[in-house]
Design a protein with these regions (language model features):
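Short active-site alpha-helical segment characteristic of glycosyltransferases
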Residues: 132, 148, 388, 420
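Short Gly/Pro-enriched turn/cap motifs at secondary-structure boundaries
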Residues: 74, 125, 353-358, 411, ...
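Bacterial Sec-dependent N-terminal signal peptides
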Residues: 1-28
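Active-site beta-strand termini and strand-to-loop segments that position acidic
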Residues: 449-452
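Active-site segment of extracytoplasmic enzymes that catalyze sulfate/phosphate-ester chemistry
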Residues: 23, 42-131, 135-141, 155, ...
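Acidic, glycine-rich loop-and-strand cores that form catalytic or ligand-binding grooves
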Residues: 408-429
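Active-site-proximal cap/lid insertion segments
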Residues: 27-30, 37-53, 60, 69, ...
Length: 510
């Protein structure tokens, strides 16, 4: 029986090095699957030291690939972190620097026994600046995005259908993604004849309220539905046409909710003394029981999905020519009843999501490509999400992307990343490095700069300096002892920050 209904919407720098790809590839371009999970901390995986949570498939990926220890998200929160991937710009330059919402103060529409927003989404990517899917389309790649978009609101100039994406299924809006049993999901599918993003209504879910005990009578679980759509898309691919898939899972972001199956039950038995949480309706977080079991189950469920992706690639004979990346958009959260201290989710780093301390931005990052990326390798190269655009361009053979795609008519346009393809392919001597890495986030009024072992965090205009080699937890501010380093990093901030009318930050005194 068909359970979903569709409705249509209207809405209010570096030069690439393609020779790095191994000669045995010849003309064939590699496929790329970029798996981005949501709010996973540096210490959430067994291969990064997590003692409680079972992640056998991701651990195997690490054993067969390269695990990075100093990889950084683009921002300590979702939308701007994703923006740095898509735009190749850090948060001092990219247009989207925060989770600006577009569902506030819009009319409501009825879904069964519920009301929901008529328009949802976040600040759009600047349509004058090229993003990754558009570059891949120009190179002849098939493009798919499955999960969270967060790069434009419904009807805006930056929805998947307008930004080089062939197939999209998931959440246009990250706020909507707080419900794992939603009223609707978004879809754009050329193969189904869509000409714009549509809403696919979850007919079974909307029979029950969005909040309260009856919410858990809903059965259409978005994480599984989105994952199945991704598997269907991979199943349609072949060795004759290169493809790139952005699998942007919402797990393990709050709310803490999932099917009552063996994954959850195993953790309920493991954590005998567990917590409950009362819910937060205005954030769309329903109440949760067994919060430790719920959270652990969400990560193991994600790990199961990763295993199914690898199985599908092998079944299709695509595994040897597919680069797979696994990472997280930012550090761990404590919303919805999550308990990062219990799990040691920060990996012994200071700070959580929304903070420019290490715990908010240092993330797990694993790269896998048989016969190209050295199995079982661990790498301490320092890089950030805005380096992924040049990296992917190198791997895909997109030549001179910065020169080709910089919009000379857009003031200040350009790209900030450096390709890490040499590192991935074992050519360390050819790897270029940043002088420093840069972050800023307006909600907590913080700026972060890292140069080598030195790390500056500016909080409400006040600089704090740490030496990560001796103080990984960022406990000891040594700014007064090293004025020359402070001066150097302040100069970096002055150079890298470009004012934004929507995302304002307090700059330090220069």
């Amino acid at each position: 029986m068909k359970t979903n209904k569709t409705i249509w919407l209207t809405g209010v720098g570096m030069i690439c090095l393609p020779t790095l790809v191994c000669a045995k590839q010849n003309v064939q371009q590699p496929n790329i699957l970029f798996i981005l999970c949501d709010d996973m901390g540096y210490g959430d995986l067994a291969c990064y030291g997590q003692p409680y949570i079972h992640t056998p498939n991701i651990d195997q990926m690490a054993r067969e690939g390269m695990r990075f220890t100093q990889a950084y998200a683009g921002s300590p929160v979702s939308a701007p972190s994703r923006a740095t991937i898509m735009t190749g710009q850090h948060t001092g330059h990219t247009h989207v620097r925060g989770n600006k919402e577009y569902w506030r103060n819009v009319p409501m529409v009825k879904y069964g026994v519920n009301e929901d927003f008529s328009v949802v989404g976040q600040e759009p990517y600047d349509p004058q600046h090229k993003i990754l899917p558009e570059m891949f389309k120009d190179k002849g790649y098939r493009t798919g995005v499955f999960g969270k978009w967060a790069g434009g609101y419904e009807g805006s100039a930056s929805t998947p259908d307008k930004r080089g994406v062939d197939e999209f299924y998931g959440y246009i809006c990250q706020f909507q993604a707080h419900l794992y049993y939603p009223n609707f999901l978004n879809r754009y599918s050329k193969s189904q004849g869509d000409t714009a993003v549509v809403r696919e209504i979850m007919e079974q879910n909307i029979q029950y309220p969005m909040f309260g005990k009856d919410y858990f009578k809903r059965k259409q679980y978005s994480a599984r539905i989105i994952h199945d759509k991704a598997l269907e898309w991979i199943d349609k691919q072949d060795s004759q046409h290169p493809f790139v898939g952005f699998l942007t899972y919402t797990l393990p972001h709050a709310e803490l909710a999932q099917p009552e199956d063996s994954i959850l039950e195993n953790y309920q038995k493991k954590f005998f003394e567990d917590k409950t949480w009362g819910g937060q309706e205005d954030s769309r977080y329903n109440a949760a029981v067994h919060t430790h079991a719920q959270f652990a189950g969400m990560i193991t469920r994600l790990d199961q999905y990763v295993g199914e992706i690898f199985a599908k690639l092998k079944e299709k004979g695509l595994d040897k020519n597919t680069v797979v990346i696994f990472t997280s958009d930012n550090g761990p959260h404590e919303e919805g009843g999550a308990d990062p201290k219990f799990f040691g989710r920060d990996g012994k780093l200071k700070g959580l999501k929304r903070q420019c301390y290490e715990g908010g931005i240092r993330i797990p990052f694993i790269a896998w490509w048989p016969e190209h990326i050295k199995a079982g390798s661990v790498n301490d190269t320092q890089f950030a999400f805005y380096d992924l655009m040049p990296t992917f361009c190198d791997l895909a053979g997109i030549k001179n992307f910065a020169k080709r795609y910089t919009n000379k008519k857009l003031a200040g346009d350009g790209f900030d990343g450096i390709s890490i393809a040499p590192t991935l392919l074992g050519k360390d001597a050819e790897q270029k490095h940043h002088e420093y890495l840069y972050w800023e986030f307006h909600e907590t009024d913080q700026i972060g700069v890292r140069k080598g072992d030195w790390k500056m965090v500016v909080v409400k205009g006040k600089p704090h300096l740490y030496n990560l080699a001796s103080d990984i937890h960022e406990d000891h501010n040594v700014a007064t002892e090293h004025p020359e380093i402070v001066k150097e990093l302040l100069a970096a901030i002055q150079k890298e920050h470009r004012d934004s009318k929507d995302f304002k930050i307090t700059l330090p005194e220069f």
